A protein has these predicted regions:
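Active-site metal-coordination/substrate-binding segment of hydrolases
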Residues: 14-85, 90-96, 101-112, 134, ...
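Fold-level recognition of mixed alpha/beta catalytic cores in primary-metabolism enzymes, strongest
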Residues: 84-176, 188
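Beta-rich nucleic-acid/ligand-interaction surfaces
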Residues: 4-7, 90-104, 203-205, 348-349
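Alpha-helix capping and helix-loop boundary segments enriched in small/acidic/polar residues
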Residues: 59-63, 167-171, 202
Length: 349
């Protein structure tokens, strides 16, 4: 499973103390800005210090869960802390399915108490964690020819802050996929917009920061379409004031695509994505400020006759998580898509 287990003997005289397991995970969320040339397999993170913060240039930093690993290594290296038996458990592939944790076998660990260090706030203890569920949606489409007298545009949504869908979802930041599909729906109605391709979001547990689509409109509507995009950008900026003020929505003329997504599939796709639940669904009734149930519309991408949509659902209440999955399935099944709910794992409190 790729896990690493390390052990440190107890301080002399403390061998009978209960053993402590310090746990973190070694993988990170590998996300970058669209204009950043970066290979997460080969390239080192370009970290820099900004005041009291360590940041990364155009990519995620990996503090989730590099901070936890650093804390564990500091404890293992120290010689000024008296302690009982200590084990360090560094699990693999946490971000994409808890693979390392699921690969643990009984008897591998000797400790009595496990302390998970996948957190970012000093001096606080977590008393629960949400469970998760993946919703994978697939549309099939036929290719249609581009109508005569069409103009093509690359529509891009950029500049959103994004964030971890299990942490920053409560901040109600913009979701690039939803911003894009809101625009597509408006322009489809107003200008007869046709969709050729779409590529929005990235990883399932990251709030989408960027999304783009290649579209066409009748040449006679091109000027009005451009102006409507500028108006739409102003509207979105106003709505996200104080939350995601860096958002930009642009439409730049592009080469005509070879084909378009068929009209029927386009119509069903745009309405289903636009109507998909996203963000905070319910706050905890018993703990102020705690998100109980949420969902992240993480990915929309077209390729080779198929359009894939991916959502990651979270809830500390199992029944709510399952029901939310069925709600999302209902939206997309009504739109003629195939829906698979998988990868469920339980929360705890």
């Amino acid at each position: 499973a790729g896990n690493v287990i390390m052990r440190k003997a107890a301080t002399p005289g403390m061998e009978s103390r209960k053993g402590i397991v310090l746990q973190a995970h070694m993988d990170m969320v590998p996300q970058k800005n669209g204009d950043k040339a970066f290979d997460f397999v080969r390239d080192p993170i370009e970290a820099y210090v900004d005041g009291e913060w360590v940041k990364a240039d155009g990519t995620t930093l990996g503090a989730d869960n590099g901070m936890g690993m650093a804390a564990i290594l500091a404890v293992l290296e120290s010689d000024d802390i008296e302690h009982g038996p200590i084990e360090a458990l560094i699990t693999a592939t946490e971000e994409t399915g808890m693979v390392g944790a699921n690969g643990l076998k009984g008897g591998m660990l000797r400790g009595d108490i496990l302390v998970n260090l996948d957190s970012e706030t000093e001096g606080e203890l977590y008393v629960g964690c949400a469970g998760g569920l993946d919703a994978s949606i697939t549309f099939s489409y036929e290719e249609e020819s581009v109508p005569a007298s069409s103009m093509a545009f690359l529509v891009e949504v950029k500049g959103l802050k994004g964030g971890h869908s299990g942490i920053e979802i409560v901040l109600e930041r913009g979701n690039a996929n939803l911003v894009l599909f809101r625009l597509l729906k408006m322009a489809e109605k107003a200008f007869g917009l046709r969709l050729s391709s779409v590529d929005g979001g990235g990883l399932r547990n990251a709030i989408p920061r960027e999304a783009r689509a290649v579209v066409t409109v009748p040449a006679a509507e091109a000027g009005a379409f451009r102006e409507s995009v500028r108006d739409f950008e102003r509207t979105v900026r106003e709505e996200l004031r104080g939350v995601d003020e860096g958002v930009s929505v642009t439409a730049e003329e592009a080469a005509l695509p070879a084909s378009l997504i068929d009209t029927d599939t386009q119509r069903r796709l745009i309405r289903a994505v636009h109507g998909c639940p996203n963000g905070v669904v319910r706050m905890s009734p018993s703990m102020k400020g705690l998100v109980q149930t949420s969902t992240n519309l993480a990915r929309v991408v077209s390729s080779g006759g198929r359009i894939a949509v991916q959502c990651l659902l979270r809830s500390s209440v199992g029944s709510e998580k399952r029901d939310l999955g069925e709600r999302i399935a209902s939206v997309f099944e009504l739109a003629g898509a195939e829906v698979v709910l998988s990868g469920a794992y339980d929360g705890w409190n």
